[in-house]
């Protein structure tokens, strides 16, 4: 059989399997008005039990809305199998998955080979797309069905990778608000898992044939939290309080995050959530692990993707120095190639600052993290430490 004929046959089988899986019913993407605008910003918070952290009613989180809505309830909840979850992060990543899916679907149907976008930072994301050899020979209905699935899978990967890049930037001092560095929130113990859940729920909502995107996210979020063993807001705060001076220090508005979650799925493809140890309300709970989004599903359908990040932020020089070889002058980050080295560098810096158990949720420190007053102070810690020192007693 000629090569072209084989390609058509393989693509045809892919499309047939998609139709069987979805029972010929398609989910609903964002409507044209929604798809015109990138997801709105939402204010997140740390998972600590300090004053400004929001703990909503875990069983009444309101209706999800891509646009502004007063019915949404955001903040930190606790689940027995998923640990603390930042609902704000989850909603943002669900929306970014939907937004990128809409844009990618359009680009694929137009045979675009270059796809670029920005998230909330200045960095530019670039995806070079190579199509199957028989792509243009498919009937339009089959092309659309395949493009929808490829767009959803690719959007999950891009959104999740973008959220990881945001955490990397904030670790190195990125100032999203333009004033104070966001270092304290970088890779805090609920971030990665919350982001991953958002991508998963967003993708599932886009495949829901019975509800529009917002209603689907509302229902899927409620179902996922219940499956993870969501707890009342009282337990969410108590769980955080139980790891004070262990996973974080501080009072009132001051907070210094010690426990960092650096598991983004690089080693085994799986993200394991951080569970609060010895929590009575969740005795014997087993963490619910989920696979990190990859390009495997896209590649299995005959597409090839080269994804790069072009950093524009001031912090880019620190990060690029990590990934450049002796003779390499790259100005772009390739996540598949470079994220491993960057995460290991961050882990080394975290261990130097907070001790060897910084990413081990079960190990307790030998001493109070606040007792080492002689430690070196980095610029990004100054605001937090100043508030902390003012609040602590003089003993």
Residue locations for each model-derived region?
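Hydrophobic/aromatic-rich structural module bridging two neighboring secondary-structure elements via a short loop
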Residues: 187-188
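Bacterial N-terminal signal peptides
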Residues: 10-19
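Divalent metal-coordination and catalytic microenvironments
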Residues: 167, 191, 197
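Sec/Tat-exported extracytoplasmic proteins
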Residues: 172, 201-205, 386-393
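Bulky hydrophobic segments
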Residues: 23-184, 203-366
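Long, internal stretches of domain cores in catalytic or enzyme-like folds
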Residues: 179, 194-200
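Cellulosome-associated attachment modules in secreted, modular CAZymes
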Residues: 364-395
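Bacterial N-terminal signal peptides that target proteins for export
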Residues: 1-10
